[in-house]
Structures are given as structure tokens and as C-alpha cells.
Amino acid sequence: MPAPKTIYFSQIAAGAWNDWVRVINISNQRAKVLAIARNHVAQTVWSAEHNLNPFEAWHPPVQGQADRRGDASLEIRSDQPIVGERHCHSGTQVLDFPGASLETRTVANRLFFPELYSGAYDWLRVFNVSEMEALISIVARDVNGRIVRQLQGRAIS
């Protein structure tokens, strides 16, 4: 499977959570990397560029920059293959998320989540990575497959 040249992070959290993102050029060529943060209506609120040598890492300054006006989504593009992760923490809670991409099959038209637990206040954030408007349908089922809740909405690119 080829490594991606574009990766996505659905949320860079403003407020109490502290975020950092690391991007690594995994090719043998110098890479030109562009990070773009967008608000909830897909308007660009911040961007930064960086050149990376082979296997060099970059930490785009998302904390206090990309999230200055609130939560943002992040797209990272490169002319060479890249991998990346988002690390965030609040007090002693630490979360890590790999960058989503078409190549790693973490961006798709259909996603399945094995469990939602109401006591944990689970929530989903959908990020449209297409140039077209998307119709989003969410169907929650119980353990017997019966529909418990259905939601539908549109997401612009």
C-alpha cells in the first residue's frame, strides 16, 4: 500500500486540550509540506508551509495558531509520502490519533464504530475531505441490530 501524500485530522481542539501534530517525510526526497486549518464551515483560518529532508519530522504550530479562533480541522499535503499523528492531552488524559488518509483506508464513504457508550458521552466529528457537498447519515443500532437512532445532515467541503 502506498503511503499518503495528504493526511487529515478532524479536530485540533481549542481550549483545555493541548494539541500537537507531528508529520514525517518518509521518502528519500526533500518534501514540501503544507498544513491547512479550517473552521466548521470549511473556511481556511490558518496555514503554514515547511520543507522536510528525508525522514525529518515537523511539528506544525497548531496549538495557539491553528486553533486560535476555536476548534479546527487540519489537512496536511505533501509532494512526497508522509505519515503523521495528533497527540493531545488535558491533565493526565492523553490521546493519540494517526492521520487519516485514503491510502490507509481511514477515509471512506462508510465507517463502522463497534461501540458507543452513553455513560462516556461519546461523540463523532465528521470531516468531509471531498470537494463536493456530502450527505452524512448516522445509524446507531443495538446489539441485536435494531435501529436505536438515525441522524442525517450535509457537510460542505
Where does each model-flagged region fall?
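Gly/Pro-rich, tryptophan- and cysteine-flecked surface segments typical
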Residues: 1-157
